Regions:
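A short, well-ordered alpha-helix in the C-terminal region of glycosyltransferases
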Residues: 359, 366, 373-387, 395-399, ...
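Conserved catalytic-core segment of nucleotide-activated headgroup transferases in glycan assembly
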Residues: 81, 204-227, 231-291, 295
């Protein structure tokens, strides 16, 4: 049975496995089906409806922040961002504690901290405390939710003076217009102060949900992402940030666009090489050659970004950090238009397309055959990227936290 499942996964991916499981369940008699307990599954929502304020005294102590996070996993850009800010805030004298919002396995305080050091670039000598659950979460000046699920816990947590929402994407759009969509959307109405990844989210949450929001800008690791000489062998190299299991990264849309593009290149004897980076896609058949790079270690990604001439960085919701990382390597970034992207990208520093495979293919072909235009915009993208700074973003978040504490205390 296990070998059969692995074969299906290899050939059809997780969608194929889930399809088989659903069919198997539906074919069984009702008496043999283990009934789902919806209330138990969403108990974190039912049990987190009251804000039970408690009286406590944190005078004459350093600022303490509780961070409530989703479970850890390799390659999570959201966790990497949070650890980046924790590193900066710790330099400013702020004490940080990290809690997972629910029990997920056999994690210990020590294993979580080591994982954050190994995978999320937490400072090796950090004094940040890590806890595998929130059962005994202690008093703090500020408690920060970092996802819609964790927001429900923070809503009910009373041992804190202030509540903040560290928003990195518009999470309702991770779902169809379903119960989960509204569960996620409702968290923006909890009255938390928002700190958002970029101005698109800040404007959206302020306008649509009347949240008090502050945003920080993106940057990149300047020790890792640098230009390298491009190969001059007559082949134009194109990369795709390929996240098949992450719908908001528009994988299917760009796979179709690349097929249209590749056919046109073949017809006109244009030599191209296409690479996919982000997830293993060996189980998918493509009608054109693909260099499947899969999931790579952070230290190996910059070389791929720099060696490609063009990199496709699609996003249906908020941008990832990949566009800036690509631009920092003097590689031309191509993305789809939309307010979610154009708070950072524009026609001067990147190529923007409609979310249409034909338009993507046409614009991609244009910069493939026009080296001068490609290199000019890539240079402008590089000049834009190098002006960004995580230090500036860290200072901005630090000032927001100080202002929250000072402003609220005045009331």
């Amino acid at each position: 049975m296990i070998m059969k499942i692995l074969k299906i996964y290899k050939n059809e991916g997780i969608k194929g496995v889930m399809h088989r499981i659903r069919n198997r369940i539906h074919s069984q008699k009702e008496t043999n089906i283990q009934k789902n307990n919806i209330n138990e599954f969403y108990s974190f929502i039912e049990n987190c409806v009251k804000d039970e304020k408690e009286e406590f005294n944190l005078e004459n102590t350093n600022i303490i922040i509780n961070w409530v996070l989703p479970p850890f996993g390799p390659g999570s850009g959201g966790h990497i961002n949070i650890m980046r800010f924790i590193n900066y805030l710790e330099k400013k004298g702020i004490s940080n504690r990290v809690y997972l919002y629910a029990r997920f396995g056999g994690e210990t305080q020590e294993s979580l901290k080591q994982f954050a050091i190994d995978y999320y670039d937490l400072n090796q000598n950090s004094n940040t405390e890590f806890y595998p659950h929130t059962d005994y979460m202690d008093y703090s000046h500020i408690t920060i939710a970092s996802s819609w699920e964790s927001a429900y816990f923070v809503r009910s947590f009373g041992k804190t003076k202030h509540k903040v929402y560290f928003v990195q994407d518009f999470e309702p759009e991770f779902f169809p217009k379903s119960s989960s969509y509204f569960f996620a959307e409702n968290t923006y109405k909890f009255g938390f102060v928002g700190i958002t990844a970029g101005s698109w989210l800040s404007k959206k949450l302020s306008k649509d949900y009347k949240m008090e929001c502050y945003d920080y800008g993106f940057s990149y690791d300047k020790e890792l992402y640098k230009p390298l000489p491009k190969k001059n062998d007559g082949i134009v190299r194109i990369g795709l940030y390929a996240r098949y299991h992450t719908p908001r990264r528009l994988f299917e849309l760009y796979v179709l666009a690349l097929n249209i593009f590749y056919k046109k290149c073949q017809k006109n004897n244009i030599k191209v090489e296409i690479s996919f980076l982000g997830q293993d896609v060996s189980h998918i058949n493509f009608p054109y050659p693909v260099n499947n790079l899969g999931t790579m270690k952070i230290k190996d990604i910059p070389k791929v970004c720099a060696e490609n001439d063009i990199f496709l960085v699609p996003s249906g919701t908020n941008l990832s950090l990949v566009p800036l990382e690509v631009m920092a390597c003097k590689t031309l970034a191509v993305s789809n238009r939309g307010e979610n992207a154009e708070w950072l990208l524009n026609d001067e520093n990147s190529i923007l397309t409609d979310a249409d495979p034909i338009d993507i293919a046409e614009k991609l072909y244009e910069v493939t055959i026009n080296k001068e235009k490609r290199e000019k915009i890539a240079e402008q993208g590089y000049n834009f990227a190098i002006k960004t700074s995580w230090e500036k973003s860290g200072e901005k978040v630090y000032k927001v936290i100080k202002n929250i504490l000072e402003k609220k205390e005045e009331k």
